[in-house]
Regions:
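Short amphipathic alpha-helices and their capping/turn segments at secondary-structure boundaries
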Residues: 1-2, 208
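Acidic (Asp/Glu)-rich catalytic clusters
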Residues: 2-4, 39
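Hydrophobic/aromatic-rich, well-ordered segments within soluble, folded domains that form packed cores
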Residues: 4-19, 216-225
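Residues that flank catalytic or metal-binding motifs in active/ligand-binding sites
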Residues: 6, 155, 234
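Catalytic-core regions of glycoside hydrolase
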Residues: 9-168
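Catalytic cores of secreted or luminal carbohydrate-active enzymes
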Residues: 144-205
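Extracellular/luminal regions of secreted and cell-surface proteins that mediate adhesion/ECM remodeling
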Residues: 192-315
């Protein structure tokens, strides 16, 4: 708890081989539910918790209904419990994570679904809770195109960079062939760049009538090109810097970036009180900061570091 700001997620409940909740004397639903509830009561609520399979998660929460947007981020165990998969992409079953028979009983929380059913389930809940693990065992399910498809649908935020080397080397020796700026890059580089969130400012527009208005309306479109959302709220600001004097004006932006799902876009509408600005030319930049880590959020735009240059405004 002392280092809660540096910890995204705690995997497992300290049971099983390598902490993976398998091969344990404490693996019944009652056991893992007791352990998880007690652990949740002790761990800082800003830290997410995780279990090895979707079946574990449903068994603990006693529901097959996926977490919904109106339940997210309220501090409850339901809103904190995510997943880690150390058999990821290892077989059609992800090494025991999934089954070969479809769901049949809506009240049997311990049954496993098929690969497609369970990935569809993760596609919903992992818009709000993290998912990660390690990709293992070189096989068709971690061939590059298959891996990208499923990592995206499962909303994967992190992977072990040391294991499985056979899979990681395969990605390093594979080439991303889709059109766009990544064409020709290694599969490893593409996957690494898309784990978690990846923000990109794709469009800006200003609506201002000097003879009629005192304020300008700036619209900024942000795309999330990553596999997952961010699960921590960042501080977002617009910075106007006078190009002659260097003086800056900061405009707070009310934006809950956690709600920007993977593959989606949000439009930020910001009112700028132009009449209260000193006359001159201003550079406009967007800033996003992780206040917990005291670090800037870097966008995917070219030449962006701590801010994204948006354009200029003349008063």
């Amino acid at each position: 708890n002392q280092y809660a700001g540096c910890i995204l997620l705690l995997q497992g409940v300290y049971t099983g081989n390598c902490g993976e909740m398998t091969g344990t004397n404490y693996g019944t639903t009652d056991d893992i539910t007791t352990l998880m509830n007690y652990q949740a009561s002790l761990i800082d609520p800003s830290i997410y918790l995780a279990v090895r399979t979707p079946t574990h998660l449903r068994s603990i929460l006693k529901t097959k209904t996926p977490l919904q947007a109106d339940q997210a981020y309220d501090g409850s165990l339901n809103s904190r419990l995510g997943l880690y998969n150390d058999g990821m992409l290892g077989s059609v079953f992800d090494l025991g994570t999934y089954d070969d028979t479809p769901f049949s009983d809506p009240y049997d929380y311990e049954e496993k679904g098929t690969r497609e059913e369970e990935i569809a389930y993760q596609n919903i809940i992992c818009q709000f809770v993290p998912n990660g693990g390690e990709a293992v065992l070189d096989n068709e399910y971690n061939d590059l195109n298959n891996a990208i498809r499923d990592l995206s649908r499962m909303h994967i935020s992190y992977l072990n960079r040391s294991h499985d080397t056979a899979v990681l080397e395969k990605w390093k020796n594979s080439t991303y062939e889709e059109s766009g700026i990544w064409k020709g890059s290694s599969g490893y580089d593409y996957i690494a760049a898309h784990l978690g969130y990846r923000y990109f400012v794709s469009k800006t527009a200003v609506d201002f009538h000097p003879l009629l208005d005192d304020t300008a309306e700036l619209n900024i479109t942000i795309d999330n090109l990553g596999f997952a959302p961010a699960y921590r709220r960042f501080t977002t600001e617009l910075i106007l810097t006078n190009r002659e004097s260097g003086d800056s004006v900061t405009v707070p932006v009310d934006f809950d970036n956690r709600r920007l799902s993977a593959g989606c876009s949000s439009v930020l509408s910001i009112s700028i009180d132009v009449r209260n600005l000193e006359k001159g030319d201003y550079n406009l930049a967007l800033s996003m900061t992780d206040e917990t880590l005291e670090l800037p959020v870097t966008f995917a735009n070219k030449n962006s570091s701590s801010t994204v240059f948006l354009g200029t405004l003349t008063r």
